[in-house]
Amino acid sequence: MKKATKYFYKRIRIKKETSSTEEEAKYEIEFIERSFSFDDYKSRTFQLFEADFDQTLRVFHLQGIEPCNWVRVKDYEIDSGVDTRNQINIMCDYREIHPAPEYTSLAPGILLSYDIETFSSDYVSFPQAEKDGDEIVQIGAVAYHFSSPEPIIKYLAVLDTCDDIDGVVVERFESEEELLIGWAEFLSKLQPDIITGYNIFGFDDDYIMKRVTKHYLWNEFSCYNRIISEPVRLSMKKLGSSALGDNIFKVITSSGSTSFDLLLHIRNEFKFASYKLDDVAYELV
């Protein structure tokens, strides 16, 4: 079977590379979708889909599932083969996942908003993550349950000393390395479902991961990933639209949580002369 599979992929790759006209492309689609027959193996058919179409969205469409709503899984198995920080891991066929419209309450997920403060070692230029002395000196965060306006916790990780602040959990660290690890451990305990902030895709996420890389802290910083064996990564995402233009965003990706940059929403929904945080807050708050 291994030999036949190799031949099949080689055949498809050659035909894809030699396609130059619409007529040729049409023929190749028909060619692929017809059944294949290899020596000593049964014939198989292959259905084609858009390669760039997200598979999660495809499941939503096929099963009639609304994003962020409850679902019911009829037949599943407990998956003990993967080491995670989840309460339960299951395996099932996607056809066993069905919408549960009778449940209308919000899930008790956790939303965390964060912001970093950085230091310029030359006191003049804007902080550069590549410079040794341009450290992260503070990471502040506030977390909520989806269904409640009252914060679960207000948190501040600070480099060096800081006075106590009423209603805020303040953790003090002697080095930037300890601060970054402390921040990751805080996320590991809280396990937020959505992580947000203002311009985090344009500054905060990238700055944090560059400092993590500078201190060789990849393993330690990945301690909050839901799937323990997977590292936290910085992903590059390109987005082009008439409202936002062409942009490249740098996003910290971790299993089990979704990141959302509030700046993108503000730029898409409101027309302001300036999108600096202070100016936007003046307009909206």
Where are the regions a protein language model picked out?
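The two-metal-ion catalytic cores of nucleic-acid processing enzymes
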Residues: 1-263, 268-285
